[in-house]
Each structure stands twice: as C-alpha cells, then as structure tokens.
Amino acid sequence: MSALNVPDSRQFILKEKDAQNIGEWIILPFQTEHDAKEPLGFMIQRHNERLLFITDSYFVRYKFKNINYLMIECNYSADILEENVINKVIHQVQKKRVLQSHFSLENVKEFLNANDLSQLREIHLLHISERNGDPERFKKEIQAMTGVPVYV
C-alpha cells in the first residue's frame, strides 16, 4: 500500500524505454532533459490514437511519428526572458536555471519542425511561465506554424 492508499497491485513503476500496458493503454516513457533526477516524457497509446506528453524538459532527443495529440511545455520565450533579466525582473542565476530546465517557445518550434505532424489533431501548451511567457502569443505562433488547434 502506498502513502496515497493505492494498493500495490494498482501501482506501476515506469522506466525509460520500457513500455507498460495499463488496461487498454500502452505507456512508453522516454528520457527528457531537465535538472531533476530521471526526467521522463510519455508516449501514451490507446487503440490507434497517440498522445505525446512532455513537460519539465528543455530538449527531447527523439523524433516521433503518428502523434494525434501533443501536450508540451512551452515555458518561456528567449526575448521575454532576456528582457526580464535586463529589467531585473529575474536574476541571472534564475535565467540559467530556466534555460537548463524548461522548454522555450523557440525549442518547441524546433521540436515540431523535427517531427512528423501529419496525424496531429491538437496541441496543448503546458507550464507557461507567468513572468517569462505569453500564452496568447505562444498559442498564435504555434497554431500558425502547425495549422492545428492549440490550447493553453
């Protein structure tokens, strides 16, 4: 029994590149880049639909195809972050941590360009910074780039 009173039989340990069947779902964890221990993203599949989930990462080395739904962190934009450092809204040390732990708008665009989006139906932008992000701008730019609905 876990601290949340979940029986052991209902708990699953997810490990990088080790797909798990959970009911009708197939969960494939993959390594992401972050300053935390063992950061993971997830390809989640049920029947013929795939959801890709990536948050708390600044880079993903893998390429994906046949993605139907994408939930991805889009934490900040480089220009907003730099402006906040210049205006002393955030400290240079905090900027360094943001750069080493979070997906920027620019990196999200690079990630999208590197992957097959032909089956993509919608994108959900996650974990947008209150100070270093602009949800409406991010939504507009990603939607214009991909041609699919984007939600924040």
Identify the meaning behind each predicted range:
Residues 1, 51-53, 146-148:
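Long hydrophobic alpha-helices with heptad-repeat/coiled-coil character
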Residues 1-20:
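Active-site HxH/HxHxD metal-binding segment of metal-dependent hydrolases
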Residues 5, 27-29, 54-55, 93, ...:
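Sparse, context-dependent recognition of short Cys/His-centered cofactor- or disulfide-binding micro-motifs
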Residues 6-8, 22-24, 48, 117-118, ...:
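Short, well-ordered coil/turn elements that cap or connect secondary structure elements
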Residues 9-11, 21, 31-33, 92, ...:
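Generic structural signal for short, flexible, solvent-exposed coil/loop and linker residues
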Residues 11-12, 27, 149-150:
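Generic structural signal for residues in well-ordered beta-strands
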Residues 14-69:
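Core dinuclear metal-dependent hydrolase active-site scaffold
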Residues 65-152:
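Cap/insert and terminal regions of metallo-dependent hydrolase folds
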